[in-house]
Curated annotation (Swiss-Prot):
Gene this chain is encoded by: proS
Keywords: Aminoacyl-tRNA synthetase, ATP-binding, Cytoplasm, Ligase, Nucleotide-binding, Protein biosynthesis
Complex formation: Homodimer.
GO MF terms held by the record: aminoacyl-tRNA deacylase activity; ATP binding; proline-tRNA ligase activity
InterPro entries: aa-tRNA-synt_IIb, aa-tRNA-synth_II, aa-tRNA-synth_II/BPL/LPL, Anticodon-bd, Anticodon-bd_dom_sf, Pro-tRNA-ligase_IIa, Pro-tRNA-synth_IIa_bac-type, Pro-tRNA-Synthase_IIa_type1
Protein task: Catalyzes the attachment of proline to tRNA(Pro) in a two-step reaction: proline is first activated by ATP to form Pro-AMP and then transferred to the acceptor end of tRNA(Pro). As ProRS can inadvertently accommodate and process non-cognate amino acids such as alanine and cysteine, to avoid such errors it has two additional distinct editing activities against alanine. One activity is designated as 'pretransfer' editing and involves the tRNA(Pro)-independent hydrolysis of activated Ala-AMP.
Gene Ontology cellular-component terms listed: cytosol
Family annotation (Pfam families): HGTP_anticodon, tRNA-synt_2b, tRNA_edit
Record has Metal-binding as a keyword: no
HAMAP family associated with the record: Pro_tRNA_synth_type1
Reactions listed under catalytic activity: tRNA(Pro) + L-proline + ATP = L-prolyl-tRNA(Pro) + AMP + diphosphate
Name of the featured protein: Proline--tRNA ligase
Domain notes: Consists of three domains: the N-terminal catalytic domain, the editing domain and the C-terminal anticodon-binding domain.
Subcellular location per the Swiss-Prot or TrEMBL entry: Cytoplasm
Length: 557
């Protein structure tokens, strides 16, 4: 791409109505322009970033076998009346009537539409499980749009919906989506925390939010750093792995099979909750070599007194697996952990799938630290039980186990293995694409402008030719490098404007192109060009003959 043929709409001044850094930079760098309150046009530079985020999401969805579809943003009211959400949603649902006086809405979500589609297209259990996704514009009539695209009325979202014949099948897909989301956010370069959340208006019985840390936003959370006088929690040294261990029913068998120290295993005990509690059962987690202290546990306000342990049947009914495979990740019950568990790292626990275990679990990386209490007979001395710090965050992803919330009321059934009709079990999984862009810009910037990772930068390489329109040599070399990089499928922007070098540098650095090639007569006289790394400011002279191969190798690495 050449700047002479491109809409590079940069501005110098910081817009007065932009409250947060991401909104300021998105306006200054020519990424978005406001059309009306909460409505934005995406300019070419912004659209390039947006498409790269979409492509990362699409690639990872394809990698796990999800199938892409496209559903209308305009939805008939009758589907929402059928599900019951027409009356539950407030004024944020934009409703309208067509010329035939039929009621419609602009969809903020697509649970009803996808459920209607699948109940008409899928007839047998043999066609399940199924995971469908789309990347689509949504609309929510926010009462007070703010912070640019962080809280706008129109937004782009990746939403996926899975259909199953059992809770165990749903749990397997839920776990897969959970880790796929972490892969997506890692590729984009976001610092994301995962917390168990209220399903809200979407519904269901279990959900997790993916929260990106940002510099300034109205939503806040407390992060807990737990430390232990005798055993400081170590930094993660292992990757999270899902390991098969069929036929294992006790800690002793698990220790023998994998030659594990028992203190590296965390076990979960399920007990009855207080009467009238939201959940009938509560999960307690202790180290493998520790036992719970009945008197201590009975003091907990969530737990029934006297203490009653859940039966194997109660556990399987509530969670879908036996007690030997219980673990903290995606556990659909309130969880309280012992102080000794709070300082564990790279530990082992069940995966909430029969015969499967997670190895290398770490708090805050793989799941948020839940409530911590003294559950055991151990006399633990904690020097700093809780170090709290408040941070700003924005939700960039949310996954839900919907169960039969929509399929039951909308009669979405398939013929089961026994020949009888059965209600499908559902999950749904969302990523806010436009919010992800804003969160990434919030994280990656400096006083010059954007510092986006190569994976989502609008261009990979910029060529700045000094005195392009006065030097035939500079013009020739600039064209050669531009063509060579383009042939190698590198996203390159050639700044061929009749502008001063200072203006070109300011614009290229503002929009955040990570690799910059500077061409000038003085360096060309000795067959050299200058290279600048946008992220760390590194500059060096390089041989003209190797620059293309060197850039390509750097990008591929």
């Amino acid at each position: 791409m050449r700047t002479s043929q491109y809409l590079l709409s940069t501005i110098k001044e910081i817009p007065l109505d932009a409250e947060v850094i991401s909104h300021q930079l998105m306006l200054r760098a020519g990424i978005i322009r406001q059309l009306a309150s909460g409505l934005y046009t995406w300019l070419p530079t912004g659209l390039r970033i947006l498409r790269k985020v979409e492509n990362i999401v699409r690639e990872e969805m394809n990698n796990i076998g999800a199938i892409e579809v496209s559903m209308p943003i305009v939805q008939p009211a009758n589907l929402w009346l059928e599900s019951g959400r027409w009356g539950q949603y407030g004024p944020e649902l934009l409703r309208f009537t067509d010329r035939s006086t039929r009621q419609f809405l602009l969809g903020p979500t697509h649970e009803e539409v996808i459920t209607d589609l699948i109940r008409n297209e899928v007839k047998s259990y043999k066609q399940l499980p199924l995971n469908l996704f789309q990347i689509k514009t949504k609309f929510r009539d926010e009462v007070r749009p703010r912070y640019g695209v962080m809280r706008s009325r129109e937004f782009i979202m990746k939403d996926a919906y899975s259909f199953h014949t059992s809770q165990q099948s749903l749990q397997a897909t839920y776990d897969l989506m959970y880790y796929t989301y972490n892969t997506i956010f890692n590729r984009i370069g976001l610092d994301v925390r995962t917390v168990q959340a209220d399903p809200g208006s979407i519904g269901g019985h279990l959900s997790h939010e993916f929260l990106a840390l940002v510099s300034n936003y109205e939503d806040q959370m407390l992060l807990i750093d737990a430390s232990h006088k005798a055993t400081e929690r170590n930094l993660p040294s292992e990757n999270l792995q899902l390991v098969d261990a069929p036929g294992i029913y006790t800690l002793t068998e698990l220790v023998k099979l994998f030659n594990l120290p028992i203190e590296k295993i965390a076990q979960i005990i399920i007990v009855h909750a207080q009467q009238n509690a939201l959940y009938p059962l509560v999960a307690l987690m202790v180290r493998g070599d520790h036992s719970i202290n009945y008197a201590q546990v009975e003091k907990l306000p969530q737990v029934a007194s006297p203490l009653v342990f859940a039966t194997e049947d109660e556990i399987r009914l509530a969670i879908g697996v036996g007690s030997s495979s219980l673990g903290p990740i995606n556990l659909p019950l309130p969880l309280i952990i012992d102080h000794s568990v709070a300082v564990m790292s790279d530990f082992v626990a069940g995966a909430n799938i029969d015969g499967k275990y997670f190895f290398g679990i770490n708090w805050e990386r793989d799941l948020s630290l839940p409530e911590v209490a003294n559950l055991t007979n151990q006399n633990i001395s904690v020097s700093q039980p809780q170090r709290l710090h408040r941070t700003n965050w924005i939700e960039v992803g949310h996954i839900f186990q919907l169960g039969s919330k929509y399929s039951k009321v909308m009669k979405a059934t398939v013929q089961g293995e026994d020949g009888n009709n059965m209600i499908m079990t559902m999950g749904c999984y969302g990523i806010g694409i436009t919010r992800v862009v804003a969160a990434a810009i919030d994280k990656y910037n400096d006083k010059q402008g954007l510092l986006l990772p190569v994976s989502i930068a609008p261009f990979q390489v910029a060529i700045i030719p000094i005195n392009l329109h006065k030097s035939l040599l500079v013009q020739t070399v600039a064209e050669q490098l531009y063509n060579q990089l383009s042939i190698r499928k590198i996203d390159v922007l050639l700044d061929d404007r009749k502008e001063r070098p200072g203006v070109m540098f300011a614009d290229i650095e503002l929009i955040g192109i990570p690799h910059i090639i500077i061409i000038g007569d003085r360096n060309l006289a000795v067959q050299k060009i200058e290279y600048k790394n946008r992220s760390n400011g590194e500059k060096k002279l390089m041989n003209l003959s190797i620059i293309v191969d060197w850039i390509v190798a750097k990008l591929n690495s």
